[in-house]
Amino acid sequence: MVMSMLTIDPVTTPKERRAFARMTVDLYKDDPNFVQPLDYEFLARLNPQSNPLLANSPHQLWLARRGGRVVGRIGAIINRNYQDHYGKSAGHFGYFEAIDDRAVIDQLFDTAAQWLRARHMVEMAGPYNFSVNEECGLLVEGFDRPPAVMMPHGKPYYAPALEAMGFTKASDMFALWYPARYGFMPEKRQAFVDKVVNRPKVEVRSFDFANFESEILTAVEIFNDAWANNWGFVPLSEAEARHMASELRPIITRYNTVMCSVDGEPSAFGIVLPNINEVIGGFDGKLLPFNWAKFLWWLKVQKPKTARMPLMGIRQKLQGKPLGAAFAFKIIEMVNNSSVDHGIVNAELSWILESNKPMIAMLEDIGAVIDKRYRIYEKPLVAA
């Protein structure tokens, strides 16, 4: 039997972008833990007119086909925000998915590497879809639970395939699973937190939803300061922050947010998202015409049972100090209690860098357990 020829084709049309988005439907048809992204949301992320990052960052997508069937995909990007921040000639790959076939996987990565090399990149790292501030990391442990909102899934054969091509670990990130409940803090710690945050010059509140975009911009400004020294950090631009605000606004509520200020200066924040993957897993990527009503019913009436905390930040000048520690616990306490009030049973805290041992220890101390590991890989690009 003659095997059909494998081709790697650049994505250039709306029809091909849709094929790029939909190829995972067949790939994961036997995996009950995979959640197909909503088509409109996924395609918007690939559109430079709606995604600020792509507007100024060269990028390309490819589809692998064999016998007319899509068997893989990959994207490559020269992230200008990353370039400006680090000054490194490192290109990134993302959106990688493929059948369990080394020829397919190897040719996808060879194609992406050639594209990056032709643009003078000397290193290839990822997966980033297409940024460290979006979905990123290859799932290497924890395939037995569906991903939380805005987190990736994957196949167990991906990591061995990348390592066989010479990719090595750059960093690991964890997702921790947390049982939401009242009274999670020991009595002495609760007394410490209450004493510190109840000072006259300290304010702890929910976001002002009448000025939601402004609140998100403030949160991003804190985030950029708080995480500036962390591995892989790339600051969020104002355009990305505004884009984030528009994406989050439909699913976020006051009880999902906390803002902490000292002497009138916003100094720490936290955001929790309802885990929409609970419900969209049955939508096959389609929200309209009927699934929109199902989504609203789930969000407003049935209520989500799980959530994810993707964003928390404390200004550097407070880190390592009693007020910074108190803010961290107070943020978790507030979103925990309000989440329980609204029916949340479990929450994912993600992602946390493997090297951030103080944060991991703090979360484990309140009952969270590491149950997913994601990995960023890197590889030098040798001249062809």
Predicted regions and their residues:
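Acyltransferase donor/substrate-recognition loop-hinge adjacent to the catalytic core
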Residues: P152-G232, N256
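Acyl-donor binding region in acyl/amide transferases
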Residues: Q83-G166, S171, F283-D365
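Short beta-strand-to-coil "C-cap" segments at the C-terminal boundary of structured domains/repeats
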Residues: S4-L6, Y178-R181, E378-A384
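Alpha-helical subdomain
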Residues: I78-N81, A361-E364, D371-A384
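A conserved beta-strand-loop-helix scaffold within acyl/acetyltransferase catalytic domains
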Residues: T24-R66, I74-D84, S206, N211-I314
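Generic start-of-chain signal for non-secretory N-termini
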Residues: M1-N33
